[in-house]
Amino acid sequence: LRVGGLGPSDDEAVGPLSQEGESLTTLGERLGFAPTDWVRLQRIHGDAFLPWLHRVARAPKDLRLRLLGGNDIAYTKLARRWWRPIAATRVGHAMQHRPVYFVSSNLHAIPNLLSGYVQRRRQLLSDFLARHEAAPDGPTGDEVQALRSLEPHANPENSLYYASRLWHQAHREQSLRDVRRAEEAERGITQIDASTGFDVGAQVIELAALHGSDLDPRLAPYAHILAASDAIILNVDYPLGLASYHIVREVMTSCDDVRGVYAIGKAATLNAAIGDVLLSSEVFDEHSGNRYAFPNAFRAKDVSKFLTIASALDNQTAVTVRGTFLQNQASLGRYYGERFTVVEMEAGPILSAVYEATRPDRHPSGERIVFRDVPMDFGIIHYASDTPYSQARTLGSRGLSVEGIDATYAAALAVLERILLTERSRISGERGEEEHAP
């Protein structure tokens, strides 16, 4: 297999082309790379990019993949190994019998909203932005400029969170990451690094250990709920495909009282714009062939109140694909013709796991399944990262950068507000039962 059309005859070309940056751009064009993908490849390899190109050019390549443990039992074992370090934490021991809210999301938005880590460094981050704004040619100059141009229209807290991301990119010392983890741990947020083949990290968040004064201002009205709650949030780092099915299934098996299952993720949109929020009430799952209809816990009004730039679209219909690389204009056109508007990679398998947690049998294949009464709160929120009809690129490969902060934090806020409101109702109900007990 000749990678990108680069063969032995091109080895000589890499040498002179590497002498100046604009010649590297020419090489990317000759190899058929889109400019953004070529820059992305350079960033991945860093200083090793040119030596890597020389190695690629030296001889034709024969690439082979071997799938290890690709059966249901092996996946189940993998999910149990993934769960063990979570169960071994102090709070993890208690998760079996306490209320648990499962969230599939990234690992930065929810801690930022709950821990106060970023707010406590407001002046530091302001000074950081000012320095890099004065030096636009620096490594983060473009993103700082983009953030500054967005600030008049963005929520100031969201801008601060993005500034924190840029600051940590510029300061990668382990000691700084340790400080952040220590502060979060003091507030009941325990980080569990990915350690198995799933490569999925997690956070165990104990609501009662959070400090009400640290909450994002938009969550401040719910601060009084924290101390009275014994609930735990399990935030898991974007499990995709069948990994999401096996992880949700393992959580349901290990925890007796799962009160909510929520998924926040990127998706391709066939009818909206980059950064818009998409709320589906029906999902076709390519893995099982099932078409799931369900009452999504979130409507446009639940998310739009936290949006300042993007739009929220509900009543969408999603398709869970097996892999983003496999999608092309023909398949996307077929889906759009069947009135699908969202293309993503996790909702279908999660729904299959929810089916098995609420029905006496394993999920079927090729059927239409309607969830009318689910014994737990369930919601899915996507935000558009790709518009494949107008941009020919692998789905999910595009980093949202500044464009994504509005939707990312609106989705996270909607989920956290939902959890806190659910906890308020649960606690009030339990108190009412105690008052009326004989």
List the predicted regions and their residue ranges.
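Accessory terminal and edge-of-domain segments that mediate assembly/interaction
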Residues: L1-P438
